[in-house]
Swiss-Prot record:
Compositional bias ranges of the Low complexity kind: 57-81, 89-101, 109-119
Region (Disordered): 1-20, 53-121
Name of the gene: TBP
One Pfam family in the UniProt entry: TBP
Keywords: DNA-binding, Nucleus, Repeat, Transcription
Name the record gives this protein: TATA-box-binding protein
Record family assignment: Belongs to the TBP family.
GO annotation, cellular component aspect: nucleus; transcription factor TFIID complex
Recorded GO MF terms: DNA binding; RNA polymerase II general transcription initiation factor activity; RNA polymerase III general transcription initiation factor activity
Function: General transcription factor that functions at the core of the DNA-binding multiprotein factor TFIID. Binding of TFIID to the TATA box is the initial transcriptional step of the pre-initiation complex (PIC), playing a role in the activation of eukaryotic genes transcribed by RNA polymerase II.
Phylogenetic placement of the source organism: Eukaryota, Metazoa, Chordata, Craniata, Vertebrata
């Protein structure tokens, strides 16, 4: 018997029998380098090549279409923002463990302040109704002495720990505390508020206290006006619910909290508007000019 024929086919390791589907795998030998003959050979077929060529051609067509779209967008007129089609919007997913620096373009943006047409003016000027100011008299005060010796002064420590003093011109009210701090309310203008605070400080000086006039500051201004038409408050609170609250069972007015300027508006169905929270007069005017176009959009037609 021939020795070569006695070896099994897998031990010969030279070639597979004729007609076999896979090439022969050489047996491992200590003399052979590691990995020799174990690397599979790529099998190329005409079908796989045609599929790759088709995919490359489709990618080239898509890149050409995107480049032409971007060129048309850059050639647009100034002032117009080019918009991408929905199929071309970019969506980026953050890597795991990281937070995205910029919001996704598909995320809806939250408006901060209502848009105001620059060309439209209301022609209405809100009137100041009350100004609250504070001043430091710079000394400790005996409230009992002030209440007993001063005119138009009342003091009830069980009810409120301050002397309540009033003057007729300007018609205002002052709250005087034992620490020397004083709050003046009721003035109709900034000048009246300062004048009234100086008069209260002079009264305290005449009672024998070394009062000064320090750190005068206006803390709040209240204005009001009338737009002369009824307003649909239900529609306004639905459209601007992130700024407003309306509970007619608790309070008849809609409370609108404007972000810039930081003003709180009380809007009533009759068209009356109250603005509060301003530090300067210009904030009252700016807030009303911002809200007036919105109120016109919710004008009640009867």
């Amino acid at each position: 018997m021939d020795q070569n024929n006695s070896l099994p086919p897998y031990a010969q390791g030279l070639a597979s029998p004729q007609g076999a589907m896979t090439p022969g795998i050489p047996i491992f030998s200590p003399m052979m380098p590691y990995g020799t003959g174990l690397t599979p050979q790529p099998v190329q077929s005409t079908n796989s090549l045609s599929i790759l060529e088709e995919q490359q051609r489709q990618q080239q067509q898509q890149q050409a279409a995107q480049s032409s779209t971007s060129q048309q967008a850059t050639q647009g007129t100034s002032g117009q923002t080019p918009q991408l089609f929905h199929s071309q919007t970019l969506t980026t997913a953050p890597l795991p463990g990281t937070t995205p620096l910029y919001p996704s373009p598909m995320t809806p943006m939250t408006p901060i302040t209502p848009a105001t047409p620059a060309s439209e003016s209301s022609g209405i000027v809100p009137q100041l109704q009350n100004i609250v100011s504070t001043v430091n008299l710079g000394c400790k005060l005996d409230l009992k002495t002030i209440a007993l010796r001063a005119r138009n002064a009342e003091y009830n420590p069980k009810r409120f720990a301050a002397v309540i003093m009033r003057i007729r011109e300007p018609r205002t009210t002052a709250l005087i505390f034992s620490s020397g701090k004083m709050v003046c309310t009721g003035a109709k203008s900034e000048e009246q508020s300062r004048l009234a605070a100086r008069k209260y400080a002079r009264v305290v000086q005449k009672l024998g206290f070394p009062a000064k006039f320090l750190d005068f500051k206006i803390q709040n201004m209240v204005g009001s006006c009338d737009v002369k038409f009824p307003i649909r408050l239900e529609g306004l609170v639905l459209t601007h619910q992130q700024f407003s609250s309306y509970e007619p069972e608790l309070f008849p007015g809609l409370i609108y909290r404007m972000i810039k300027p930081r003003i709180v508006l009380l809007i009533f169905v009759s068209g009356k508007v109250v603005l509060t929270g301003a530090k300067v007069r210009a904030e009252i005017y700016e807030a009303f000019e911002n809200i007036y176009p919105i109120l016109k959009g919710f004008r009640k037609t009867t």
